[in-house]
Amino acid sequence: MTDQSTFDPGLPDSVRVLAGPGQGEMTEQRSRFLAFAFPAPDETAAREAIAGVARRYHDARHACSAWRLGHGLLPHEHRNDDGEPSGTAGEPLLAAIRKRELTDCVVVVVRYFGGVKLGTGGL
Protein backbone atom coordinates (compact mmCIF):
# COMPACT_ATOMS: atom_id res chain seq x y z
CA MET A 1 0.00 0.00 0.00
CA THR A 2 1.29 3.49 -0.88
CA ASP A 3 1.62 6.01 1.91
CA GLN A 4 -0.47 8.83 0.44
CA SER A 5 1.02 11.39 2.82
CA THR A 6 4.39 11.18 1.02
CA PHE A 7 3.17 10.65 -2.54
CA ASP A 8 3.64 13.68 -4.79
CA PRO A 9 2.16 13.29 -8.29
CA GLY A 10 4.18 16.33 -9.43
CA LEU A 11 7.51 14.57 -8.96
CA PRO A 12 8.53 11.95 -11.51
CA ASP A 13 9.95 8.58 -10.48
CA SER A 14 13.05 9.37 -12.56
CA VAL A 15 14.45 12.25 -14.58
CA ARG A 16 16.60 12.46 -17.71
CA VAL A 17 19.81 14.46 -17.38
CA LEU A 18 22.97 14.72 -19.45
CA ALA A 19 25.78 12.41 -18.36
CA GLY A 20 28.30 15.04 -19.44
CA PRO A 21 28.89 17.85 -21.93
CA GLY A 22 28.46 17.32 -25.65
CA GLN A 23 28.92 19.27 -28.85
CA GLY A 24 28.12 19.20 -32.55
CA GLU A 25 28.66 21.22 -35.70
CA MET A 26 26.82 21.79 -38.97
CA THR A 27 26.94 24.12 -41.96
CA GLU A 28 23.85 25.49 -43.67
CA GLN A 29 24.28 27.71 -46.74
CA ARG A 30 27.77 28.76 -45.61
CA SER A 31 26.63 29.66 -42.07
CA ARG A 32 28.46 27.56 -39.48
CA PHE A 33 26.63 26.43 -36.36
CA LEU A 34 28.40 25.07 -33.27
CA ALA A 35 26.17 23.47 -30.64
CA PHE A 36 27.06 22.76 -27.02
CA ALA A 37 25.08 20.97 -24.31
CA PHE A 38 26.04 21.02 -20.63
CA PRO A 39 24.64 19.57 -17.43
CA ALA A 40 23.40 22.48 -15.30
CA PRO A 41 22.12 21.79 -11.78
CA ASP A 42 21.02 25.41 -11.30
CA GLU A 43 20.62 28.78 -13.02
CA THR A 44 24.11 29.93 -12.01
CA ALA A 45 25.70 26.92 -13.74
CA ALA A 46 23.53 27.49 -16.84
CA ARG A 47 24.48 31.17 -17.06
CA GLU A 48 28.18 30.34 -16.55
CA ALA A 49 28.05 27.77 -19.37
CA ILE A 50 26.45 30.30 -21.73
CA ALA A 51 28.98 32.99 -20.77
CA GLY A 52 31.87 30.56 -21.27
CA VAL A 53 30.74 29.65 -24.79
CA ALA A 54 30.10 33.32 -25.64
CA ARG A 55 33.61 34.26 -24.44
CA ARG A 56 35.28 31.43 -26.32
CA TYR A 57 33.40 32.19 -29.55
CA HIS A 58 33.24 35.98 -29.11
CA ASP A 59 33.62 36.51 -32.85
CA ALA A 60 30.43 34.56 -33.68
CA ARG A 61 27.38 36.52 -34.81
CA HIS A 62 25.01 34.95 -32.24
CA ALA A 63 25.10 32.70 -29.16
CA CYS A 64 21.51 31.49 -28.74
CA SER A 65 20.60 29.39 -25.73
CA ALA A 66 17.96 27.56 -23.75
CA TRP A 67 17.85 25.77 -20.42
CA ARG A 68 15.47 23.60 -18.45
CA LEU A 69 16.09 23.18 -14.73
CA GLY A 70 14.31 21.36 -11.94
CA HIS A 71 11.84 18.53 -11.75
CA GLY A 72 8.12 18.18 -11.34
CA LEU A 73 5.25 19.80 -13.16
CA LEU A 74 6.80 23.26 -13.52
CA PRO A 75 10.50 23.16 -14.37
CA HIS A 76 12.34 26.50 -14.70
CA GLU A 77 12.83 27.22 -18.40
CA HIS A 78 14.60 30.03 -20.23
CA ARG A 79 15.45 30.79 -23.84
CA ASN A 80 17.41 33.56 -25.61
CA ASP A 81 17.47 34.36 -29.33
CA ASP A 82 20.57 36.62 -28.97
CA GLY A 83 19.66 38.91 -31.83
CA GLU A 84 18.11 36.34 -34.15
CA PRO A 85 14.47 37.10 -35.05
CA SER A 86 12.22 36.62 -32.01
CA GLY A 87 11.25 33.00 -31.35
CA THR A 88 13.44 31.53 -34.10
CA ALA A 89 16.41 30.21 -32.13
CA GLY A 90 15.89 29.95 -28.36
CA GLU A 91 12.39 28.49 -28.58
CA PRO A 92 13.37 25.67 -30.99
CA LEU A 93 16.31 24.84 -28.69
CA LEU A 94 13.97 24.66 -25.70
CA ALA A 95 11.51 22.55 -27.71
CA ALA A 96 14.31 20.05 -28.46
CA ILE A 97 15.17 19.84 -24.75
CA ARG A 98 11.50 19.28 -23.89
CA LYS A 99 11.05 16.66 -26.63
CA ARG A 100 13.85 14.61 -25.13
CA GLU A 101 12.39 15.14 -21.64
CA LEU A 102 15.72 16.46 -20.36
CA THR A 103 16.18 18.59 -17.28
CA ASP A 104 19.07 20.28 -15.51
CA CYS A 105 20.73 21.14 -18.81
CA VAL A 106 21.62 24.10 -21.00
CA VAL A 107 22.13 24.20 -24.77
CA VAL A 108 24.07 26.96 -26.54
CA VAL A 109 24.36 27.36 -30.32
CA VAL A 110 26.76 29.87 -31.85
CA ARG A 111 26.40 30.98 -35.43
CA TYR A 112 29.02 32.27 -37.79
CA PHE A 113 27.14 34.09 -40.55
CA GLY A 114 28.02 32.83 -44.01
CA GLY A 115 26.60 35.69 -46.05
CA VAL A 116 23.24 34.09 -46.88
CA LYS A 117 20.14 35.01 -44.87
CA LEU A 118 18.46 31.75 -43.85
CA GLY A 119 15.00 33.07 -43.05
CA THR A 120 13.20 32.40 -39.79
CA GLY A 121 12.43 28.69 -40.06
CA GLY A 122 14.33 26.69 -37.49
CA LEU A 123 17.46 28.75 -36.99
Stretch-by-stretch model annotation:
Residues 54, 97-102:
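Signal for well-folded cores of large energy- and translation-related assemblies
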Residues 105-110, 115-123:
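Glycine- and Gly-Pro-enriched alpha-helical subdomains that act as flexible
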Residues 1-87:
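C-terminal regulatory domains involved in ligand/effector binding and gene-expression control
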Residues 86, 90-96, 123:
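Conserved mixed alpha/beta catalytic, RNA-binding, or beta-rich assembly cores of soluble enzyme
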Residues 72, 79, 103-104, 110:
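Hydrophobic alpha-helical segments and their boundary regions
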